Protein backbone atom coordinates (compact mmCIF):
# COMPACT_ATOMS: atom_id res chain seq x y z
CA UNK A 1 0.00 0.00 0.00
CA UNK A 2 1.40 3.39 -1.03
CA UNK A 3 2.22 5.76 1.83
CA UNK A 4 1.03 9.33 1.33
CA UNK A 5 1.72 12.67 2.98
CA UNK A 6 -0.81 15.47 2.58
CA UNK A 7 0.73 18.95 2.67
CA UNK A 8 -1.21 22.18 3.23
CA UNK A 9 0.52 25.59 3.18
CA UNK A 10 -1.61 28.13 5.05
CA UNK A 11 -1.70 31.83 5.82
CA UNK A 12 -4.67 33.30 7.70
CA UNK A 13 -7.06 30.55 6.65
CA UNK A 14 -9.33 30.50 9.71
CA UNK A 15 -12.41 30.35 7.45
CA UNK A 16 -11.12 27.45 5.35
CA UNK A 17 -8.64 25.28 7.24
CA UNK A 18 -11.21 23.06 8.96
CA UNK A 19 -13.01 22.44 5.66
CA UNK A 20 -9.89 21.27 3.83
CA UNK A 21 -8.86 19.04 6.74
CA UNK A 22 -12.30 17.42 6.85
CA UNK A 23 -12.29 17.02 3.06
CA UNK A 24 -8.99 15.16 3.23
CA UNK A 25 -9.75 12.96 6.23
CA UNK A 26 -13.22 11.93 5.06
CA UNK A 27 -12.24 11.35 1.42
CA UNK A 28 -11.74 8.01 -0.33
CA UNK A 29 -8.43 6.73 1.07
CA UNK A 30 -9.15 2.98 1.02
CA UNK A 31 -6.25 1.94 -1.19
CA UNK A 32 -3.59 4.28 0.24
CA UNK A 33 -1.95 4.75 3.62
CA UNK A 34 -2.26 8.37 4.76
CA UNK A 35 0.68 8.55 7.14
CA UNK A 36 0.43 12.25 8.01
CA UNK A 37 -1.00 15.65 7.22
CA UNK A 38 1.58 18.43 7.40
CA UNK A 39 0.43 22.03 7.72
CA UNK A 40 3.06 24.74 7.26
CA UNK A 41 1.49 27.88 8.67
CA UNK A 42 2.39 31.58 8.91
CA UNK A 43 -0.98 32.73 10.22
CA UNK A 44 -1.67 35.64 12.55
CA UNK A 45 -5.41 34.87 12.84
CA UNK A 46 -7.15 31.95 14.60
CA UNK A 47 -5.87 29.29 12.19
CA UNK A 48 -3.43 27.79 14.77
CA UNK A 49 -6.10 27.39 17.46
CA UNK A 50 -8.55 25.85 14.98
CA UNK A 51 -5.93 23.34 13.84
CA UNK A 52 -4.96 22.45 17.40
CA UNK A 53 -8.61 21.88 18.31
CA UNK A 54 -9.02 19.74 15.21
CA UNK A 55 -5.97 17.69 16.20
CA UNK A 56 -7.51 16.98 19.61
CA UNK A 57 -10.71 15.70 18.02
CA UNK A 58 -9.21 13.46 15.33
CA UNK A 59 -6.85 10.51 15.45
CA UNK A 60 -5.07 11.15 12.14
CA UNK A 61 -1.47 12.24 12.53
CA UNK A 62 -1.30 15.99 11.91
CA UNK A 63 2.01 17.85 12.06
CA UNK A 64 1.54 21.58 12.57
CA UNK A 65 4.59 23.68 11.67
CA UNK A 66 3.86 27.26 12.73
CA UNK A 67 6.04 30.31 12.08
CA UNK A 68 5.54 33.48 14.12
CA UNK A 69 6.43 35.59 11.08
CA UNK A 70 5.36 35.28 7.47
CA UNK A 71 7.93 33.37 5.43
CA UNK A 72 5.93 32.80 2.26
CA UNK A 73 4.64 29.95 0.13
CA UNK A 74 8.06 28.76 -1.05
CA UNK A 75 9.18 28.21 2.55
CA UNK A 76 5.92 26.40 3.31
CA UNK A 77 6.33 24.02 0.36
CA UNK A 78 9.98 23.36 1.28
CA UNK A 79 8.99 22.67 4.90
CA UNK A 80 6.29 20.21 3.92
CA UNK A 81 8.43 18.34 1.41
CA UNK A 82 11.46 18.04 3.67
CA UNK A 83 9.35 16.76 6.59
CA UNK A 84 7.25 14.34 4.53
CA UNK A 85 7.72 10.62 5.19
CA UNK A 86 5.22 9.31 2.61
CA UNK A 87 6.29 7.92 -0.74
CA UNK A 88 4.03 10.47 -2.44
CA UNK A 89 3.29 14.03 -1.34
CA UNK A 90 -0.11 15.50 -2.21
CA UNK A 91 -0.20 19.29 -1.86
CA UNK A 92 -3.44 21.21 -1.43
CA UNK A 93 -4.04 24.94 -1.09
CA UNK A 94 -5.78 25.65 2.20
CA UNK A 95 -8.80 27.28 0.54
CA UNK A 96 -9.78 24.48 -1.84
CA UNK A 97 -12.30 21.64 -1.55
CA UNK A 98 -11.06 18.40 -3.12
CA UNK A 99 -13.71 15.98 -4.30
CA UNK A 100 -13.82 12.69 -2.33
CA UNK A 101 -11.71 10.76 -4.86
CA UNK A 102 -9.24 13.57 -5.65
CA UNK A 103 -6.39 12.36 -3.42
CA UNK A 104 -6.74 8.83 -4.76
CA UNK A 105 -6.78 10.07 -8.37
CA UNK A 106 -3.64 12.14 -7.79
CA UNK A 107 -1.81 9.23 -6.16
CA UNK A 108 -2.84 6.57 -8.69
CA UNK A 109 -1.13 8.31 -11.63
CA UNK A 110 2.30 8.43 -9.99
CA UNK A 111 4.68 5.62 -10.97
CA UNK A 112 8.32 4.95 -11.87
CA UNK A 113 8.10 7.24 -14.91
CA UNK A 114 5.60 9.87 -13.70
CA UNK A 115 6.96 12.38 -11.21
CA UNK A 116 4.01 14.78 -10.95
CA UNK A 117 0.27 14.47 -11.42
CA UNK A 118 -1.60 17.73 -11.96
CA UNK A 119 -5.12 18.15 -10.62
CA UNK A 120 -8.16 19.57 -12.39
CA UNK A 121 -9.18 22.75 -10.51
CA UNK A 122 -12.79 23.82 -11.08
CA UNK A 123 -14.35 27.06 -9.83
CA UNK A 124 -17.62 26.82 -7.92
CA UNK A 125 -20.49 28.10 -10.06
CA UNK A 126 -21.25 31.79 -9.55
CA UNK A 127 -23.24 34.27 -11.64
CA UNK A 128 -21.09 37.34 -10.92
CA UNK A 129 -19.19 38.81 -13.88
CA UNK A 130 -15.71 38.42 -12.29
CA UNK A 131 -16.60 34.84 -11.36
CA UNK A 132 -17.72 34.11 -14.92
CA UNK A 133 -14.39 35.44 -16.14
CA UNK A 134 -12.61 33.07 -13.76
CA UNK A 135 -14.76 30.18 -14.96
CA UNK A 136 -13.98 30.96 -18.62
CA UNK A 137 -10.23 31.12 -18.00
CA UNK A 138 -10.41 27.86 -16.08
CA UNK A 139 -12.35 26.15 -18.89
CA UNK A 140 -9.70 27.28 -21.36
CA UNK A 141 -6.91 26.03 -19.08
CA UNK A 142 -8.58 22.64 -18.68
CA UNK A 143 -9.03 22.43 -22.44
CA UNK A 144 -5.37 23.13 -23.25
CA UNK A 145 -4.18 20.78 -20.50
CA UNK A 146 -6.08 17.96 -22.14
CA UNK A 147 -4.45 18.72 -25.50
CA UNK A 148 -0.76 19.00 -24.61
CA UNK A 149 1.83 19.36 -21.88
CA UNK A 150 2.67 23.04 -21.36
CA UNK A 151 3.54 25.68 -18.79
CA UNK A 152 -0.15 25.63 -17.82
CA UNK A 153 -0.35 21.93 -16.92
CA UNK A 154 0.52 22.00 -13.21
CA UNK A 155 -1.43 24.40 -11.03
CA UNK A 156 -0.62 24.91 -7.36
CA UNK A 157 -4.17 24.39 -6.05
CA UNK A 158 -3.53 20.64 -5.90
CA UNK A 159 -0.89 18.25 -7.19
CA UNK A 160 0.94 15.07 -6.29
CA UNK A 161 4.67 14.46 -6.54
CA UNK A 162 6.99 11.58 -5.74
CA UNK A 163 8.65 12.31 -2.43
CA UNK A 164 12.10 11.13 -3.50
CA UNK A 165 12.01 13.55 -6.44
CA UNK A 166 10.56 16.45 -4.45
CA UNK A 167 13.28 16.22 -1.80
CA UNK A 168 15.88 16.99 -4.49
CA UNK A 169 14.19 20.32 -5.27
CA UNK A 170 14.69 23.50 -3.25
CA UNK A 171 12.18 26.22 -4.10
CA UNK A 172 13.80 29.69 -4.12
CA UNK A 173 12.54 32.17 -1.54
CA UNK A 174 9.94 34.59 -2.87
CA UNK A 175 9.16 32.52 -5.97
CA UNK A 176 5.64 33.12 -7.31
CA UNK A 177 5.20 30.40 -9.96
CA UNK A 178 6.14 27.51 -7.68
CA UNK A 179 4.07 25.02 -9.66
CA UNK A 180 5.77 25.85 -12.96
CA UNK A 181 9.20 25.79 -11.30
CA UNK A 182 8.60 22.31 -9.88
CA UNK A 183 7.16 21.04 -13.18
CA UNK A 184 10.25 22.24 -15.04
CA UNK A 185 12.57 20.67 -12.47
CA UNK A 186 10.83 17.31 -12.67
CA UNK A 187 10.88 17.32 -16.48
CA UNK A 188 14.56 18.26 -16.35
CA UNK A 189 15.22 15.15 -14.24
CA UNK A 190 13.74 13.01 -17.00
CA UNK A 191 10.36 12.21 -15.43
CA UNK A 192 6.92 12.68 -16.95
CA UNK A 193 4.26 15.15 -15.85
CA UNK A 194 0.62 14.16 -16.36
CA UNK A 195 -2.77 15.85 -16.03
CA UNK A 196 -5.64 13.87 -14.51
CA UNK A 197 -9.03 15.41 -15.37
CA UNK A 198 -10.66 13.19 -12.74
CA UNK A 199 -8.62 14.70 -9.89
CA UNK A 200 -11.10 17.51 -9.31
CA UNK A 201 -10.55 20.19 -6.70
CA UNK A 202 -13.07 22.98 -6.23
CA UNK A 203 -12.18 26.58 -5.49
CA UNK A 204 -14.03 29.86 -5.05
CA UNK A 205 -13.84 32.13 -8.12
CA UNK A 206 -13.04 35.83 -7.97
CA UNK A 207 -15.84 37.92 -6.47
CA UNK A 208 -14.64 41.33 -7.65
CA UNK A 209 -12.86 42.78 -10.67
CA UNK A 210 -9.95 43.66 -8.39
CA UNK A 211 -9.62 40.02 -7.31
CA UNK A 212 -9.86 38.79 -10.91
CA UNK A 213 -7.28 41.31 -12.13
CA UNK A 214 -4.90 40.56 -9.27
CA UNK A 215 -5.03 36.83 -10.08
CA UNK A 216 -4.19 37.49 -13.73
CA UNK A 217 -1.42 39.94 -12.85
CA UNK A 218 0.08 37.53 -10.32
CA UNK A 219 0.16 34.75 -12.92
CA UNK A 220 1.88 37.04 -15.42
CA UNK A 221 4.36 38.24 -12.79
CA UNK A 222 5.15 34.65 -11.87
CA UNK A 223 6.08 33.75 -15.44
CA UNK A 224 8.07 36.99 -15.85
CA UNK A 225 9.93 36.31 -12.61
CA UNK A 226 11.16 32.99 -13.96
CA UNK A 227 12.32 34.74 -17.14
CA UNK A 228 14.31 37.27 -15.09
CA UNK A 229 15.86 34.42 -13.15
CA UNK A 230 16.83 32.98 -16.56
CA UNK A 231 15.11 29.76 -15.69
CA UNK A 232 14.41 27.61 -18.73
CA UNK A 233 10.77 26.67 -19.22
CA UNK A 234 10.03 23.48 -21.10
CA UNK A 235 7.02 22.61 -23.25
CA UNK A 236 5.64 26.02 -24.20
CA UNK A 237 1.97 25.99 -25.17
CA UNK A 238 1.67 26.17 -28.95
CA UNK A 239 -0.07 29.24 -30.37
CA UNK A 240 -2.28 26.98 -32.48
CA UNK A 241 -3.57 25.06 -29.46
CA UNK A 242 -4.04 28.25 -27.44
CA UNK A 243 -6.14 29.90 -30.16
CA UNK A 244 -8.13 26.83 -31.20
CA UNK A 245 -9.11 26.08 -27.61
CA UNK A 246 -9.87 29.75 -26.92
CA UNK A 247 -12.38 29.85 -29.76
CA UNK A 248 -13.75 26.43 -28.85
CA UNK A 249 -14.43 27.50 -25.26
CA UNK A 250 -15.78 30.87 -26.42
CA UNK A 251 -18.35 29.09 -28.59
CA UNK A 252 -19.89 27.44 -25.54
CA UNK A 253 -19.25 30.23 -23.02
CA UNK A 254 -19.40 33.54 -24.87
CA UNK A 255 -20.50 35.49 -21.80
CA UNK A 256 -17.54 34.15 -19.86
CA UNK A 257 -15.18 35.24 -22.63
CA UNK A 258 -16.74 38.70 -22.62
CA UNK A 259 -16.40 38.85 -18.83
CA UNK A 260 -12.61 38.63 -19.12
CA UNK A 261 -12.60 41.86 -21.15
CA UNK A 262 -14.88 43.98 -18.95
Regions found by a protein language model. Name each.
Residues 23, 40-49, 69, 96:
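A conserved acidic beta->alpha catalytic loop
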Residues 46, 94-108:
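Acidic donor-binding/catalytic loop of UDP-sugar-dependent glycosyltransferases
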Residues 3-5, 36, 181:
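Cell-envelope/extracellular polymer assembly enzymes that use nucleotide-activated donors
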Residues 110, 116-138, 172-240:
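Catalytic donor/gating beta->alpha subdomain of glycosyltransferases that bind UDP-sugars
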Residues 65, 72-75, 106-167, 213, ...:
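Long helical/loop segments within the catalytic core of UDP-sugar-dependent glycosyltransferases
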Residues 22-34:
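Short, acidic, metal-binding catalytic loop of nucleotide-sugar glycosyltransferases
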Residues 67-84, 181:
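Glycine-rich, basic loop-to-helix element that forms the pyrophosphate-binding segment
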Residues 89:
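Short aromatic/hydrophobic "clamp" motif used to bind/position activated sugar donors
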Amino acid sequence: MTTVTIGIPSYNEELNIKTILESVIFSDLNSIDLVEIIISDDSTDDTPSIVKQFMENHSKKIIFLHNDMRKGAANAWNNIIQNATGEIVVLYDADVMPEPNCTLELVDKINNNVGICASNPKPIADRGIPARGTIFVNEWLESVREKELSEYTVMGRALSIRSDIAKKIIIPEGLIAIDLFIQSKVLGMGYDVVFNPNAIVLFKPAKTFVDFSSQVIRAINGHNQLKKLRYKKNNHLSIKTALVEFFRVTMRNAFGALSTCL
